[in-house]
């Protein structure tokens, strides 16, 4: 395949056109008075969104060189989304401002490599200022404010705050479709996994079709149980203790299953058998989680334990185990709190070290189950289009809220970046030559988000920004919704520190890469051939 090449200034200008196309489409959504963008879908109804990364991903340009610039901006948005879950539009606006300012300097003869060094140093200085301005979340109201701003909706903010308050920092919160028009939150207490009873004969509540075991012993094994003789000794010990028994095993079948059912029907021993959750190594880890939560031991030949040898001390215990047809919930596991804490710390370390999204998701799920909380936000709306948009906003707000819990919050509305500008300008003056130019372009770009927020509200930025800077108070800013100067924290106009920091760092990274680009290489577009003419028959 033949390639096309572009060099020097031509290359950079083509990239800039691509950057501007994406950034101009994205930046109109910034702030509480930002507009929406309608995205055409090849199937189903169109999507209406104000989420920067969703809009950026949909844009594909015909010109191959401009498309390269567009891809770089998409990278800014998606990287910020991956790290912080929000701030994609802010990152895009910052990147565009840095690139436009940087290209002017490169065209005027500045050395891009030295400029890049200046950009990196100035970004570190700005991040330091952002961290200094950060404060920890102090209340449920703070969480609600962060979520409300990200979702642009107070009701969603309160629902997320309620969910996070119940499940805690390590709990899992998922978003599903509601069967009604209402948006609400459902909680699952304790550890839940998606395996139910092996036989309906174990049911104790025929109305709900559930087996409910109060203060049971829990036998946990990775083996298949089919011979009754292997479990008779432990069944006798549990029956003598006068408590019910829950068996979690790879499978329970044959005479072992019929003995358990028969004992249950005769009233000799209340019991229920459940298949172990997960598969392979994941199953082993989940069984260990259950064992640690309940204070039991996983009966496995790997550690030299057989079913015949176990004592009642090897069994786990809980306040309540509720088993339905398709899921099981263990409430109030009686494991050692220190052992549970150690297991949680171990899973957290694994989450930090894994690069696989799927692996991360399953580990977070296990973490939540051990921490004892799963919340499901049921999103309701009148139409499919509105539902899609609402779910998207809830997911974004959840990510932003987690980021806020992790690193704290700063004044929102672009004010924190604006206030970092002065320190970065002073720092730039300590540098020299083209490094200084690189640092200065970072300083100049720091007011781009606040300007865009004010413009999107139909107001003039210059006067408002001047008045904000006049007052030397990091909490002081402008509420574009109410059109007045306020204490940003008291008014609930706050952003997660992680979001603001990530947006700036990712924008600076992409701007540096683009400014140091000299050559573009792209594939030549294929010529589309028209349909061939059918052969005409010979004329005689």
From Swiss-Prot:
ATP binds at residues 29-32, 86-90, 413, 479-481, 495. Its main location: cytoplasm. Keywords: ATP-binding, Chaperone, Cytoplasm, Isomerase, Nucleotide-binding. It comes from the Bacteria. InterPro entries: Chaperonin_Cpn60_CS, Cpn60/GroEL, Cpn60/GroEL/TCP-1, GroEL-like_apical_dom_sf, GROEL-like_equatorial_sf, TCP-1-like_intermed_sf. It catalyses: ATP + H2O + a folded polypeptide = ADP + phosphate + an unfolded polypeptide. The keyword ATP-binding applies. One of its GO terms (biological process) is protein refolding. Its EC number is 5.6.1.7. It is an enzyme of class 5 (isomerase). It is found in: Cytoplasm. One of its GO terms (cellular component) is cytoplasm. Pfam families: Cpn60_TCP1. NCBIfam families: GroEL, PRK00013.1, PRK12849.1, PRK12850.1, PRK12851.1. Together with its co-chaperonin GroES, plays an essential role in assisting protein folding. The GroEL-GroES system forms a nano-cage that allows encapsulation of the non-native substrate proteins and provides a physical environment optimized to promote and accelerate protein folding. Belongs to the chaperonin (HSP60) family. Forms a cylinder of 14 subunits composed of two heptameric rings stacked back-to-back. Interacts with the co-chaperonin GroES. This is Chaperonin GroEL. The gene is groEL.
């Amino acid at each position: 395949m033949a390639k096309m090449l572009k060099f020097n200034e031509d290359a950079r200008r083509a990239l800039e056109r691509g950057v501007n196309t994406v950034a101009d489409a994205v930046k109109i959504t910034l702030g509480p008075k930002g507009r929406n963008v309608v995205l055409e879908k090849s199937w189903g109804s169109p999507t209406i969104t104000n989420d920067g990364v969703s809009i950026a991903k949909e844009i594909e340009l015909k010109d191959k060189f401009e498309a390269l610039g567009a891809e770089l901006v998409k990278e800014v948005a998606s990287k910020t989304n991956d790290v912080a879950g929000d701030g994609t539009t802010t990152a895009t606006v910052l990147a565009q401002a840095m690139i436009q300012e940087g290209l002017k300097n490169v065209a005027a003869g500045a050395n891009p490599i030295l400029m890049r060094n200046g950009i990196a140093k100035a970004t570190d200085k700005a991040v330091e200022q952002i961290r200094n301005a950060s404060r920890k979340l102090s209340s449920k109201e703070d969480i609600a404010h962060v979520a409300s701003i990200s979702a642009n909706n107070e009701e969603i903010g309160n629902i997320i705050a309620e969910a996070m308050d119940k499940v805690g920092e390590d709990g899992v919160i998922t978003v599903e479709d509601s069967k009604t028009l209402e948006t609400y939150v459902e909680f699952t207490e304790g550890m839940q996994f998606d395996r139910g009873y092996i036989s309906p004969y174990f049911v104790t509540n025929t109305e709900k079709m559930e087996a409910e075991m109060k203060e049971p012993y829990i036998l946990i094994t990775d083996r298949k149980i089919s011979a009754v003789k292997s479990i008779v000794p432990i069944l006798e010990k549990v029956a003598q203790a006068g408590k019910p028994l829950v068996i979690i095993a790879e499978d329970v079948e044959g005479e072992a299953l019929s003995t358990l059912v028969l004992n249950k029907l005769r009233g000799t021993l209340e019991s229920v058998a459940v298949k172990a959750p997960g598969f392979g190594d994941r199953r082993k880890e989940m069984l260990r989680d259950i064992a640690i939560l309940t204070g039991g031991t996983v009966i496995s030949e790997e550690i030299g334990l057989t079913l015949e040898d176990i004592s009642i001390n090897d069994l786990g215990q809980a306040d309540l185990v509720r088993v339905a047809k398709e899921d099981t919930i263990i409430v109030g596991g009686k494991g050692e709190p220190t052992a549970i804490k150690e297991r949680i710390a171990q899973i957290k370390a694994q989450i930090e070290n894994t690069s696989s999204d799927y692996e991360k998701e399953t580990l977070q799920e296990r973490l939540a189950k051990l921490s004892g909380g799963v919340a499901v936000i049921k999103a309701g709306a009148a139409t499919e289009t509105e539902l899609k948009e609402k779910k998207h906003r809830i997911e974004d707000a959840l990510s932003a809220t987690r980021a806020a819990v992790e690193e704290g919050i700063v004044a929102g509305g672009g004010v924190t970046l604006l206030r970092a500008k002065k320190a970065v300008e002073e720092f730039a003056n300590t540098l020299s030559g083209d490094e200084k130019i690189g640092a200065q372009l970072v300083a100049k770009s720091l007011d781009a988000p606040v300007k865009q927020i004010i413009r999107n509200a139909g107001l003039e930025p210059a006067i408002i920004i001047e008045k904000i800077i006049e007052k030397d108070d990091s909490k002081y800013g402008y509420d574009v919704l109410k059109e007045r100067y306020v204490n940003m924290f008291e008014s609930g106009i706050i952003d997660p520190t992680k979001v603001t920091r990530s947006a700036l760092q990712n924008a600076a990274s992409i701007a540096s890469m683009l400014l140091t680009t000299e050559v573009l290489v792209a594939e030549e577009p294929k010529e589309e051939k028209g349909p061939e003419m059918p052969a005409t028959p010979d004329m005689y």
